[in-house]
Amino acid sequence: GDVYKRQALTEIPGSSSVLSRGFVTYSNQSKIDMLGVRLKTLELHGAVSGQTVSEMASGAITASNGEADYAIAVSGVAGPDGGNKEKPVGLVYICILKKGEVGEIKKYIFRGDRHSVRYQTVMKALDNLTQLV
């Protein structure tokens, strides 16, 4: 999802004035190393959870060294593999965080193939962001 979001944003002329940076953190270790997600959060709730995206968004704000006013964090099961009864393919958590405020976490279950789930995630994340800005 992160790559699609950056592509969607960077297609707009002048986007470099509003997009500071992005993080691709597929592995749990990268979430810990790059965004400061706590190991305990990952152990208790898993990578695909509201708690994890909340910590990811907070970590992105911190990692921006004061440059970012907003952070978008996404984690999900895009498929075709990786889903189970508790966390099916299509499950996505999105957190939009404004610096200094509590993040808004939303849970979605999207339908379709991997590309479709990722596309729907990007569109929903950007829609959620525009509602807050």
Predicted regions: what they are:
Residues 5-133:
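Short alpha-helical segments enriched in small residues
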